Swiss-Prot record:
The UniProt record lists the keyword Repeat: yes
LRR repeats: 226-245, 246-281, 291-315
Family matches, as SUPFAM superfamilies: ARM repeat, RNI-like
Originating organism: Mus musculus
UniProt xrefs under Pfam families: LRR_Zer-1, ZER1-like_2nd
The encoding gene: Zer1
Residue ranges of coiled coil: none
Protein name according to UniProt: Protein zer-1 homolog
Length: 779
């Protein structure tokens, strides 16, 4: 099982400071700009964590509000020291890098920061003397600058910002730079001249960059240990250059905090475009022969000719082996030792028996699929989404044997690619199967909370129907409301947002209403009142109104009334909202339109029982039409006794206000009383109930009074039924809430009916016997 170890003190303090910046580390200058308090000095370990955690909070926690001038806290290296920071996506703009230009950064990772322009290229020069590692992966606009040359007024009126490619920037002066990632950049960047000043590159990533002549790579043949050419359109000329990079044969190099293993990645996305180049037996043999000490190789996505593999009949028998001499891939038999990693995703080779590598990415089994998700998540969402889709099939059809690893990898992918439709669809679908009851015992509270967070992030960031449906279904795998309480307000807001469009997808509507109903069941009144103010009552009434117009009584209709029943329980404000927004008209219309829908009737009457418990609202129920409807429902046999019981409960509270409050001529009060007595006497005292009382307070207030004996009798019958049928639940509740002395007083009352007193004695007897049977007599 996953560990439920608490967060470190460092993590807790970092989180608190970031959520309370102007109350902890800084203050607001001119009510806008953050400034560090003058008496604070923060070392690099703390500064790096603050920045990196800030990025994580902004990208992963939608409830966290970013601060426009956050990076200004780190503008002065005399009080703050930054060394290694990882920034991503639209969070970072030119002015943010400009704010920290005086820092001696050693490591700067900028991933998919599309708001960065050529202004940031100039800022990068500020770090040239200290930078060892730089990633500009996916920063597609950083080599563009605005240009409004004279004589193009007409063009600039249409497009005031004319963008031109920067061609004169180079890495001149970046003398310490060893690691560089320029992957996923736009076409046209003059890579050769850009990189020429770098003398000692150890790792280079040119993913997606097309260059017909790769000869310039040989300038680092004595230093380059890791080369990534993912999605580069290769040719035999490229291969001839690659095999000259003899340092790719080297073993692990230590450079500062980094360990670089010799790695070659010539993989591709097989769906992105047509590639003429095919990996032949000759090419693979050449790579192994010339780069025999490679520790890691990725050839995923390539069309590989069949003569590369050993035939099934010639394969070594016995257990799968990583020994090169037994390799099912013929050219790899020349390896001196097994590879640490071999990327074979979406190639035929991954399905072979003997693969000379300790870790393989592929699509053959769960292990290979998880390795693929792990290897490609950060920079290759197109591959990651397909790998997660394979994991989805494994979790759905078979059994996931590495559950915790799978969950963590999917969570990471969803956080990393919050706005990628394919990953959000496949990831949310995989989470549904990975969190179901079969796997529940293996998951810690912390891990399940991480799942909830990432699901809510998906719902918040992506309005696509499939994502919304998958996320709602995944939430159904959790104990509601208990496991969602730490995000209670947020999840309700999201669900109500889903339900607001009345033409919403039917399946999502049904799931969302079910979740809303579960969320307001068994929670305290403060929660219910807060959700009511968020528009819960109004949203449910609109759904009901829409179903009425369609003349449809389905699960959405029934769940909506059930949700209203739950949210109005002991919450007068929500009851009043129900009345104010035409709830009684909808009740009458539903009753008329769907006379045979028993569960619907029960839910509606349960809700009206809650309304009737509020003294200030009861006058609104005192109309001839409403009283007649309630009286007629006393004789209903729908859903056992439930509809009749709830109708009698509504009338009992109305009767409790006395004859002077009876403001209608028809039906007469005495007539209704007689019908109530008859209904109560017709009920089976041993009836099993479809009801759940959290408190007896509304019932108990009907006991110590003589103004309405029938109300008193209904309350006593309710208690007798519940303590008889469900003694373990309701005897302790009645004793706890002081019901016993009230029942004893009732027995002494002259106005109480004899049958009511007799029933009260039986309730007292049941509870007394229960207390004696459950008394702890151990010593």
């Amino acid at each position: 099982m996953a560990s439920d170890t608490p967060e470190s003190l460092m993590a807790l303090c970092t989180d608190f400071c970031l959520r309370n910046l102007d109350g902890t580390l800084g203050y607001l200058l001119d009510k806008e700009t953050l400034r560090l308090h003058p008496d604070i000095f923060l070392p690099s370990e703390i500064c790096d964590q603050l920045v990196n955690e800030y990025v994580e909070l902004v990208s992963a926690a939608c409830t966290f509000e970013p601060h426009e001038t956050f990076f200004s806290l780190f503008s002065d290296p005399r009080s703050t020291r930054l060394t290694r920071i990882h920034l991503r996506e639209d969070l970072v703009q030119d002015q943010d890098l400009e704010a920290i230009r005086k820092q001696d950064l050693v490591e700067l990772y900028l991933t998919n920061c599309e708001k960065l322009s050529a202004k940031s290229l100039q800022t990068l020069r500020s770090f040239r003397h200290s930078l060892v590692s730089l990633s500009l992966s996916g920063c597609a606009n950083i080599f563009y600058e605005e240009d409004n040359p004279g004589g193009c007024e007409d063009e600039c009126l249409v497009n005031p910002t004319c963008q031109v490619l920067v061609k004169d920037f180079t890495f001149e002066g970046f003398s310490r730079l060893r690691f560089l990632n320029l992957g996923r950049m736009i076409d046209g960047i003059p890579v050769e001249s850009l990189l020429r000043p770098l003398n000692s590159l150890a790792a280079l990533d040119l993913s997606g960059i097309q260059t017909s002549d790769a000869t310039f790579l040989t300038q680092w043949k004595d230093s380059l240990m890791s080369l990534v050419l993912y999605n580069m359109d290769l040719s035999d000329d490229h291969i001839r250059v690659i095999v000259q990079l003899h340092k790719l044969r080297s073993k692990i190099l230590t450079c500062g905090p980094h360990l670089i293993s010799s790695h070659l990645d010539i993989s591709r996305d097989r769906l992105s475009s047509y590639y003429k180049f095919k990996l032949t037996r000759k090419v693979l043999s050449l790579l192994v022969q010339k780069l025999g000490n490679l520790m890691s190789l990725d050839i995923s996505g390539h069309m590989i000719l069949e003569n590369c593999s050993i035939s099934k009949t010639d394969e070594e028998a016995g257990q799968t082996s990583t020994e090169p001499s037994k390799s099912s891939i013929m050219p790899f038999r020349a390896l001196k030792r097994p590879l640490q990693f071999l990327g074979l995703f979406e190639t035929s080779l991954c399905r072979l028996t003997h693969i000379p590598a300790y870790k393989v990415s592929g699509d053959k089994n769960e292990e290979q699929v998880l390795n693929a998700i792990e290897a490609y998540t950060e920079h290759r969402p197109e591959i990651t989404s397909r790998a997660i889709n394979l994991l989805f099939d494994i979790a759905r059809i078979e059994r996931c044997n590495q559950l915790l690893r799978a969950l963590k990898l999917v969570i990471t992918a969803l956080k990393c690619h919050k706005y990628d439709k394919n990953i959000q669809v496949t990831g949310s679908a995989a989470l549904f199967y990975l969190t179901n009851s079969e796997y529940r015992s293996e998951q810690s509270v912390k891990l399940r909370r991480q799942v909830i967070q990432v699901v809510l992030n998906g719902m918040e960031s992506y309005q696509e129907v499939t994502v919304q449906r998958n996320c709602c279904l995944t939430l159904c795998n959790f104990s509601i409301p208990e496991e969602l309480e730490f995000q209670y307000r947020r999840v309700n807001e999201l669900l109500l947002g889903i339900l607001s469009p009345t033409r919403q997808d039917e399946s999502i509507q049904r799931i969302a209403v079910h979740l809303c109903n579960a969320l307001v069941c068994q929670v305290d009144n403060d929660h219910k009142e807060a959700v009511g103010k968020m528009g819960f009552v109004v949203t449910m009434l609109k759904l009901i109104q829409k179903k009425l117009l369609d003349k449809t009584c389905d699960q959405v209709m029934e769940f909506s009334w059930s949700a209203l029943w739950n949210i109005t329980d002991e919450t007068p404000d929500n009851c009043e909202m129900f009345l104010n927004f035409n709830g009684m008209k909808l009740f009458l219309d539903c009753l008329k339109e769907f006379p045979e829908k028993q569960e619907l009737h029960r839910n509606m009457l349960g809700l009206l029982g809650n309304v009737a418990e509020v003294k200030e609202l009861r006058p609104q129920l005192m109309t001839s039409q409403f009283i007649s409807v309630f009286s007629n429902l006393l004789e209903s046999k729908a859903d056992g006794i439930e509809v009749s019981y709830n109708a009698c409960g509504v009338l009992s509270h109305i009767m409790f206000d006395g004859p002077e409050a009876w403001g209608v001529c028809e039906p007469q009060r005495a007539e209704v009383e007689d019908r109530m007595w008859a209904a109560i006497q017709s009920w089976d005292i041993n009836s099993r109930r479809n009801i759940n009382y959290r408190s007896f307070e509304p019932i108990l207030r009907l006991l110590p009074q003589g103004i309405s004996p029938v109300s008193q009798h209904w309350a006593t019958w309710a208690l007798y039924n519940l303590v008889s049928v469900y003694p373990d639940k309701y005897c302790p509740l009645l004793i706890k809430e002081g019901g016993m002395p009230l029942l004893r007083d009732l027995i002494k009352m002259a106005t109480a009916r004899q049958e009511t007193k007799e029933m009260a004695r039986k309730v007292i007897e049941h509870c007394s016997n229960f207390r004696e049977e459950n008394m702890d007599t151990s010593r």
